[in-house]
Amino acid sequence: MARVKRGVIARRRHKKILKLAKGYYGARSRVFRVAKQAVIKAGQYAYRDRRQRKRQFRALWIARINAGDRQNGLSYSRLIAGLKKATIEIDRKVLSDLAVNEKAAFAAIVEKAKAVLA
């Protein structure tokens, strides 16, 4: 049986992991065994946080909208109910941007929601 030489494959695999671990602290960027664990953990965090990012942004948008509509004398839930009744289809991302940067336009939208609710 012929001798199997696999140094090239092992080197390639190690280099790939160490390249992914570049910039990590201490042994996590230098020692293959530790680097491999660090890269796997980083991947798990990245996967989890890609999903959490969507939740966090939605929560941020809702907080901004809530702050803006309370300045105009309406709660968040009442505003959303009013917008649905008035068939104004603006998503929360755009609403929050208006609440922060275009206060007059946001106030006009809140007034329309108030008018439908009254």
From Swiss-Prot:
GO CC annotations on file: ribonucleoprotein complex; ribosome
Gene3D superfamilies: 6.10.160.10, Ribosomal protein L20
Molecular function via GO: rRNA binding; structural constituent of ribosome
Keywords per UniProt: Ribonucleoprotein, Ribosomal protein, RNA-binding, rRNA-binding
Keyword RNA-binding tagged: yes
Xref: PROSITE patterns: RIBOSOMAL_L20
Superkingdom: Bacteria
Record flagged with keyword Plastid: no
InterPro entries: Ribosomal_bL20, RIBOSOMAL_L20_CS, Ribosomal_protein_bL20_C
Gene Ontology terms describing biological process: ribosomal large subunit assembly; translation
Pfam families reported in the protein's UniProt record: Ribosomal_L20 (PF00453)
Protein purpose: Binds directly to 23S ribosomal RNA and is necessary for the in vitro assembly process of the 50S ribosomal subunit. It is not involved in the protein synthesizing functions of that subunit.
Assigned protein family: Belongs to the bacterial ribosomal protein bL20 family.
Name of the protein: Large ribosomal subunit protein bL20
Species: Azotobacter vinelandii
Taxonomic path: Bacteria, Pseudomonadati, Pseudomonadota, Gammaproteobacteria, Pseudomonadales
Gene that this polypeptide is encoded by: rplT
